[in-house]
Each structure stands twice: as structure tokens, then as C-alpha cells.
Amino acid sequence: MKFHVLTLFPDMVMQGLMTSITGRAVQQKKIDIDAVNIRDYTQDKHGRVDDYPYGGGAGMLMQAQPVYDACQSVMEKIPQNKKKRVIYVTPQGIPFTQAKARELAAQDELLLLCGHYEGIDERVLEEVVTDYISIGDYVLTGGELAAMVIVDAVARLVPGVLGNEQSALTESFHGELLEHPQYSRPDVWHGKKVPEVLLSGNQKHIDAWKKEQSILRTKERRPDLYARYVRLQECRQLLMKQKLLHIDMIELINRGRAQLLYFGQGQILLKDMEYEIYFHACVDPSRLPDIRTWTLPVEKIPLAVLHQEEMIPY
């Protein structure tokens, strides 16, 4: 997988990403990271890439021309058959989540555009950007730190990047639950003991403890995630009433890959966050609606809704 970071500060980006896991992944050729200096594409003889905004206002604005040319220089090198996205990191974007990281990890190449000053001319954003993503409701000096966060989170999901492939499946934010508390040697530290169950060697009891602690921690620290988890479990209980018919959706929930899009009127709609496939279950056949009339938290369904009886093109 290739990451192209379009920035005014390429050294900052490369210094941050060429260490630890992402740095090793580049050395092992699991991923490729390219920092493109937008300033190299300006037509201004003084090397300027910014100007005053029309209509007044504080600060300077990055101009459209150097941003567009930098982006095009990268896009021209990407084969047409490669899956690619152009991401503008901005507080105005959708929140970056682990689900979004999984979605982006399915791409072949990602271009991350970093703004600076007061932002970038809106016209070039309208022309090249496919995704607007925010890492939080606060303001940074530029988009570089946000871009590095996204690269790190997505890179971890690329096969072979993590030494232990199970790490990405068990750490915080896989599924709807936070990770359970963890302990290492010594058994006792500052008078605090490691929970006895972890020393018991009984894997069944250990797994049950981990699940219980994950639920408790999520409820305490992230009530928003806990509410989503409870809702998914309610769906699972309904689906279990016709287990053979809905086994695919049940497994999706069990594996932490299910995103609940709709639950009501006897209908359940789930999204497989890894493969972007949609699963529909009608748990009350007497109330089967027209799926196209639903108001969903997605712009469109890119593949199809997988109905239990047939594939329904969307």
C-alpha cells in the first residue's frame, strides 16, 4: 500500500513516520510513504504558495494551482485499475475512527492533503478531494500531524505490518468494545497483584474475564461505544431466533466487523466494515419495507444489500 502526503513540510512528515512500526514497514516494503512538497509545484518565482483570501479575513490561504499540480503529479503515476482516495485533513471533516481506518486500508493508494495557514482554496478541494476527515474538534498549525495519525492507523491494518497479526484484532476499538486491562511481570507491584484468573492457566476463564472487563471498561470510559455495543447485542438476540437463516450476520457481529446502520420496524441492516458489503434481515416479514426509502448514515451503498433470499442491487 502506498501513502502520498502532500505537504509544505515533507521533512516533518518523514521524520515522524520513518520510526517505529511504520518505519520498519517501509524498510520491509510492506508499505511505501512518499512526502510530496507542494512548494515544488508553485509557478511563483519567489516560491510562494499562499495569498490573501478574497472577501478579507485574517491570515493567508494556500492557492489552488500548486496544490492541484502536486496532486496531479501523483495521480498521473497511479495505474487506472488501482483503488485510490484523496483525503483532505480538516476539522470540518467526518470523525476519523477505526472503522474508517479499515475502510481506507482496503485502498491501494491514499493521497493525504495537508492544509496550512487558513486552509486551501475551495475550488481545488472541490476538484480533487474524495474524503474530508477530522481527527478531532480542535485546531492544529497544519494538517501534517493529522495525516501522520491516519497513516499510522491505516498502516497497522495492512497485512504483514504488525509482527503479530492478531494484534490488530484484539486491541482497543476492534469492534465496539475497548481493550481489557493488561498486566506484565512482576506478579505484585506497589502492593497491587495481577488478577488471579490471569495466572490460572485456564484459557476459558481468562477469555471470559477479558470479555467482562472489556464491557465494564467500555461502559465506564466510553458510554457512546457501550450504547452501540448493547444495540448490536439486541440485534444478535433477534437474529439468533432464526440462527440458520441469519448465521452470516451473527458471525459478522461476533467477529467485531458489524456496523449497525438500521434497527427498527422489524428490520436490521448491517455493514461489513472490512469488505463494505451490506446485510439485511427482515425479522418481521409482515413489515418488509422498500429499502430505498430508508434514511441511512451513508451517501450510497456501493455494492449491494445482501438480502437473505436474494441479492438486491442498489
Named regions from a protein language model:
Residues M1-I78, K204-E220, D224-L225:
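N-terminal nucleotide/polyanion-binding subdomain common to many enzyme families
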Residues M1, P186-D248:
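SAM-dependent methyltransferases
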Residues Y275-Y314:
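Pre-active-site segment of Zn-dependent metallo-hydrolases
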Residues L270-M273:
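Active-site beta-strand termini and strand-to-loop segments that position acidic
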Residues Q63-H116:
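S-adenosyl-L-methionine/SAH cofactor-binding core of RNA-modifying enzymes
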Residues I120, V124-E171:
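Structured adenosyl-cofactor binding patch, chiefly the S-adenosyl-L-methionine
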Residues L145, L157-E196:
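Internal, active-site/partner-interface "lid" segment
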Residues H4-L6, D34-V36, R85-I87, L110-L111, ...:
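Hydrophobic/aromatic beta-strand patches that form the interior of the parallel beta-sheet core
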